[in-house]
Curated annotation (Swiss-Prot):
Cytoplasmic face of the membrane: 1-165, 324-366, 436-479, 579-649
Protein name (database record): Endoplasmic reticulum membrane protein 65
Carbohydrate-modified residues: N215
Record key words, sorted: Endoplasmic reticulum, Glycoprotein, Membrane, Phosphoprotein, Transmembrane, Transmembrane helix
InterPro entries per UniProt: Tatp1
Residue positions, PTM Phosphoserine: S94
Source organism (scientific name): Schizosaccharomyces pombe (strain 972 / ATCC 24843)
Any one GO biological process: protein folding in endoplasmic reticulum
Membrane topology of this protein: Multi-pass membrane protein
Length: 649
């Protein structure tokens, strides 16, 4: 190829771009004002034995970058600039020949700059017919991309991976919830016995001036048990006067848009209460609040101050959960599908708020814990609503018909399947897209399970420091509001139980009175409000609901149910402990290879939101083996749905 061979000082623009296409192929000037004879490359004759491709090329756009203004280059004289500006830049097209054996193109004609082989291979569209042929015959083959194939595999594998973590967290939440109704009453009895012994020893040493025991103070774990019992009992008494039926009809009378706003407000209030309540209860159960001298007034003032704040939180959070249950009950019992559609659309909006954001592993762990807690809360709400609707159905049913039939079960359970099914679908879709956009492998959820297993095993190994049980420690990390859920369950269950008992007693009295008036063999007739006669067979009354109510009514029945609940709690806790120990041993073996796990937790944890993320857990979660290679995304290759910053817009 030809090149400029003029001596003297080179142009400033050309000295900066000596390797550029412009400085190599455009004409250059000397400072003396004479044109430099540009060397035009000689036309090489193509080999006729080799096939060639002739492509017409347009004028290069790089010719426009050659500036000749004297104001920009003051060293040049006016004559030099004028002579340079006189040189025309032709728009004629040249023909480039490509040979199979020669990598450099041969330029013929008046050519401003050489072009690459890729640019030369593109056909110039000269008329409309060529454009049509180009559109119809263009090659639309997409090159293979292993990263996108991996994205699709991870997207499809995410639901199975998250369900294993969600299922473990859900069972831990059930174990923590059953703990309050089974083992916690036994711990309270032990705490009362310990308190009585401490009081007796104190009185004995006071009156007889003897030191019967070197340590007469109540252990901190027993104080926490008594405080929990006092909080649950006080909250249940304060919310007892709330008329749930009246609240139900007030919410049901609202318009759909108000109902939608109310549901969102309650959901936000629930999360805020969870974030604040855990800190409040931790302050109340802390060592410096409970460890003070009995005769110290300042210690008592601090204790009552935090107890009042904790009680206010318990009442507020219980009311929020109660309103959520009533709102969900209105949705389930609504004859219009619009309300249920609003509820499901509210769950789908959750995808928009979470998917198009950048997630670190710590944030994904917090989101996973939040979803586990939300799923468990929905389970408790569904059970409460089902029992409530069952009591209403038992109140309005006739005596000669069974309480539960296939048709009634379908009517009762169909809305719950819609609610729970939509929740599962939203969780799967949300986490799958988060995994895709943030270049994370689904194996990260296995590490989340390892973190929860570590908490369970570590709390069980340190029995002297654990005051709330193994499952309670895991529930505390996940942010599960166990005490407010227990309070709202007690409040609704007591009302449902009273409805069952009163309805059953009323039906028995009606059957006896009608049987006395109309004695016909085994059949007794009573009249419904709609004046339709029905036959009631007293000999066949022993249905499952009647048998259950007769058993539970006595003290022996209550003791039997309590024993069954304790056995269920112990079996579930033992199964969870076996799973966590096996995973913990394998986790230690895995982490010893990569040296990314420390076995002892630090005393001061770092809180982010209401889910705990300390430095050790953060280092454990940030493991490079769970990452996918993140390609660099310059502006020319940036795609619409690629996570480049903190959010996808």
């Amino acid at each position: 190829m030809g090149s400029n061979t003029s001596p003297g000082q080179a142009d400033p623009l050309e000295s900066e771009n000596e390797s550029s296409l412009t400085s190599r192929f455009l004409p250059n000037k000397r400072d003396g004002g004479k044109d430099n004879e540009s060397v035009i490359p000689e036309k090489e004759e193509p080999d006729l034995n080799e096939p060639v491709l002739a492509v017409p090329l347009p004028k290069s756009r790089y010719a426009l970058t050659k500036r000749s203004s004297s104001s920009e280059y003051p060293r040049r004289s006016a004559s030099t600039s004028a002579k340079k500006n006189v040189i025309p830049i032709t728009r004629s097209y040249s023909t480039t020949f490509f040979s199979k054996t020669n990598d450099q193109p041969t330029v013929t004609g008046n050519q401003d700059k050489p072009i690459s082989r890729l640019r030369a291979s593109k056909l110039q569209i000269q008329n409309f017919w060529n454009y049509i042929c180009f559109e119809l015959l263009a090659n639309d083959t997409v090159p293979a991309n292993p990263i996108k194939e991996k994205h699709v595999e991870n997207f499809l594998a995410t639901p199975y991976a998250i369900e294993k973590t969600f299922l473990f967290g859900w069972f831990v939440s059930v174990d923590s919830f059953l703990y309050i109704f089974t083992l916690f009453p036994i711990r309270v009895l032990i705490s009362f016995f310990t308190l009585s012994r401490c009081i007796f020893q104190g009185l004995f040493s006071t009156f007889f001036h003897r030191n019967s025991s070197p340590n007469r103070s109540l252990p901190r774990s027993r104080k926490i048990d008594l405080l929990k019992l006092l909080l649950i009992f006080s909250t249940s008494i304060l919310i007892r006067k709330i008329d749930v039926s009246r609240l139900y009809h007030i919410i049901r009378a609202q318009a759909s848009i108000r109902f939608y706003v109310l549901y969102n407000v309650l959901e936000i209030a629930d999360r805020l209460c969870c974030a604040l309540g855990q800190d409040v209860l931790d302050c109340l159960f802390s060592n410096h609040i409970l460890s003070f001298n009995f005769w110290n007034p300042a210690g008592w003032m601090t204790f009552f101050y935090y107890f009042a704040i904790s009680l206010a939180y318990m009442v507020l959070h219980t009311l929020v959960l109660l309103y959520q249950i009533i709102t969900l009950n209105v949705t389930v019992n609504s004859y219009s599908n619009a309300v249920l559609a609003l509820l499901m659309s509210n769950q789908l909006v959750e995808i928009k708020g979470a998917v198009f954001k950048k997630f670190e592993k710590e944030n994904l762990f917090q989101l996973t814990c939040s979803d586990v807690v939300e799923r468990f809360q929905i389970t408790i709400m569904v059970i409460i609503i089902f029992l409530r609707n069952l009591a209403e159905l038992y109140t309005t049913s006739s005596l000669d018909q069974p309480l539960l039939t296939f048709k009634r079960l379908k009517t009762l359970l169909a809305p719950f399947f819609w609610v729970i099914g939509s929740e599962l679908f939203v969780d799967w879709l949300k986490h799958a897209f988060i995994i895709k956009f943030n270049y994370i492998k689904p194996s990260i959820y296995s590490r989340f399970t390892d973190v929860l297993c570590h908490d369970y095993v570590a709390s069980g190994a340190q029995l002297t420091q654990t005051v709330t049980g193994c499952s309670q420690q895991v529930a505390r990390r996940m942010g599960l509001p166990v005490l407010p859920l227990v309070c709202v369950f007690i409040r609704t269950s007591m009302q449902t139980w009273s409805m069952f008992r009163s309805t059953h007693s009323m039906k028995q009295e009606i059957a006896k009175s009608i049987g006395t008036i109309f004695p016909t063999k085994d059949n007794y007739v009573y009249y419904l409000p709609n004046k339709e006669a029905n036959t009631y067979n007293a000999g066949k009354e022993a249905s499952w609901e009647t048998l259950l109510l007769s058993v539970v009514r006595g003290k022996s029945g209550i003791a039997f149910l309590f024993f069954m609940a304790i056995m269920l709690k112990l079996l579930l806790g033992k199964a969870i402990l076996a799973i966590t120990q096996s995973r913990y041993e394998s986790m230690q073996q895995r982490e010893e290879k990569i040296n990314s796990w420390e076995r002892e937790r630090k005393a001061n944890n770092f809180f982010r939101g209401h889910i705990e993320i300390d430095k050790k857990t953060k280092d454990f979660l940030n493991n490079s083996k769970d990452d996918l290679p993140v390609p660099k995304s310059p502006l020319l290759t940036l795609e619409r749905y690629a996570m480049h910053s903190k959010r996808i817009w």
